[in-house]
């Protein structure tokens, strides 16, 4: 059986965080004093201007003020924000070079979904953005970029991560004796990053930064403020706050340290291959295991991936041609074996029994609309273009299966995050970046 397009949703972005991030990038420049714009960084053949950086800086200061967080020194904040822009820029450049795009129809659907998440119509959402000084057209462009970044990560990293049944078995065996395996944690973290192969001097310098951060925390400085000043993690400006995570999705070391802690407590410095961590336990909750009866779908699919060699347009053309052949009587299994680029191709595209949430939203929505025997029109997801056929449906007790699925997702999440950071660092290292922040 091939992959089930896992990762519960490659576009499961936390909408409120996303909205805040978009507003940051699009706030109007400070009025009153006019400054001469100039280049603060060159990224390959692209430039980042002082105006862009100032817009993000002003909005970030506004956001930190709303959160009641004392901002780090201006020079530190500028450097962190500039690096964030650079990382986004190199990813978007790769996406553009490889033909990764988002259609207007998909973008409009996403905007409607964001508005609904905020209990607004699209028109009400437009007005709300305007009241915050955010242009809807610019917001729309930023959302397009965010979708592209998510899909790029899935294409280049996440869908290349594999998890074996042996890894799942071992994971479950090691979790059996843990009293907190059903616990979920909401934590904040500070990461002082250092590459795994860094020399001792660089690692010592990173350790000293971590000790400085810990000293500030012990002196009573708010965790969010210290995270904003010291952390190298992408969520530093959000106070290092992470969403709820099952204990199974944390590293074993983190889970062991967090188990005896009370909400509000802070760890010491935790070394890891990629740097030094400091954690704060914000909340803990318990999710008891219960019998789960759910509706499942047995389906098969054909996948044409978008890659450096196959543009989105080429992939769409190929999958459309395959759909025409199916409409003219060709057998789904035979075409899947010959043309599908998913690991399920040798079995005729058979994905086995699929539970709600196993696949990405685009795939699940199209599959749910089909009757047994029916074949979908071409469906786009972060993995590429699909044709889907529903074979049959059933209601099933999946308690044990869900346990294994949860373990599989935890392993995949750990592997994917490590792989993504390594991939992003390689992409960053290959890029030509020239800093001109001190000029002007």
From Swiss-Prot:
Keyword Endoplasmic reticulum: no
Main location: periplasm
Gene3D superfamilies for this protein: 3.10.50.40, Porin chaperone SurA, peptide-binding domain
Leader sequence segment: 1-25
Top-level division of the source organism's lineage: Bacteria
EC numbers: 5.2.1.8
Pfam families: Rotamase, Rotamase_3, SurA_N
Keyword terms, alphabetized: Chaperone, Isomerase, Periplasm, Repeat, Rotamase, Signal
Domain PpiC: residue ranges: 182-283, 294-392
Entry's free-text remark on domains: The PPIase activity resides only in the second parvulin domain. The N-terminal region and the C-terminal tail are necessary and sufficient for the chaperone activity of SurA. The PPIase activity is dispensable for SurA to function as a chaperone. The N-terminal region and the C-terminal tail are also required for porin recognition.
Name used for this protein in its record: Chaperone SurA
Species this protein is from: Nitrosospira multiformis (strain ATCC 25196 / NCIMB 11849 / C 71)
Annotated gene: surA
């Amino acid at each position: 059986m091939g992959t089930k397009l896992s990762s519960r949703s490659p576009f499961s972005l936390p909408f409120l965080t996303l909205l805040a991030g978009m507003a940051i990038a699009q706030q109007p420049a400070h009025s009153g004093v006019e400054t001469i714009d100039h280049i603060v960084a060159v990224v390959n053949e692209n430039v980042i201007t002082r105006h862009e950086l100032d817009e993000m800086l002003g909005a970030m200061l506004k956001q930190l003020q709303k959160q009641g967080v004392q901002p780090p020194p201006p020079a530190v904040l500028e450097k962190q924000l500039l690096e964030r822009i650079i990382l986004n820029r190199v990813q978007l450049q790769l996406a553009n070079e490889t033909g990764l795009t988002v259609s207007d129809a998909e973008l409009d659907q996403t905007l409607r979904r964001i508005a609904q998440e905020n209990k607004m119509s699209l028109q009400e959402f437009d007005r709300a953005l305007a009241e915050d000084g955010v242009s809807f057209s610019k917001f729309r462009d930023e959302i397009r970029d965010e979708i592209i970044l998510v899909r790029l990560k899935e294409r280049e990293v996440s869908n290349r991560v594999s998890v074996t049944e042996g890894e799942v078995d071992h994971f479950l065996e090691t979790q059996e004796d843990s009293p907190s395996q059903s616990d979920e944690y909401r934590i904040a973290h500070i990461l002082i990053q250092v590459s795994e192969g860094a020399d001792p001097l660089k690692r010592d310098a990173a350790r000293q930064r971590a000790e400085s951060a810990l000293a500030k925390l012990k002196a009573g400085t708010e965790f969010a403020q210290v995270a904003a000043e010291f952390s190298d993690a992408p969520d530093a400006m959000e106070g290092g706050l992470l969403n709820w995570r099952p204990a199974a999705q944390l590293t074993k070391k983190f889970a062991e340290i967090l188990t005896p802690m009370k909400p509000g407590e802070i760890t010491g410095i935790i070394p890891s291959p990629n740097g030094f961590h400091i954690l704060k336990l914000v909340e803990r909750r318990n999710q008891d295991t219960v019998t789960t009866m759910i509706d499942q779908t047995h389906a098969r699919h054909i996948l044409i991936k978008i890659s450096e060699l196959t543009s989105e347009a080429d992939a769409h053309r190929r999958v459309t041609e395959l759909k025409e052949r199916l409409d003219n009587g060709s057998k789904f299994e035979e075409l899947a074996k010959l043309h599908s680029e998913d690991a399920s191709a040798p079995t005729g595209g058979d994905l086995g029994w699929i539970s709600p949430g196993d696949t990405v939203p685009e795939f699940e929505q199209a599959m749910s609309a089909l009757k047994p025997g029916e074949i979908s029109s071409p469906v786009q997801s972060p993995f590429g273009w699909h044709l889907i056929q529903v074979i049959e449906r059933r209601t099933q007790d999946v308690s044990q299966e869900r346990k294994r699925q949860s373990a599989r997702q935890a392993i995949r999440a750990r592997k994917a995050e490590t792989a993504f950071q390594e991939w992003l660092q390689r992409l960053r290292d290959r890029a030509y970046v020239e800093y001109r922040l001190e000029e002007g």
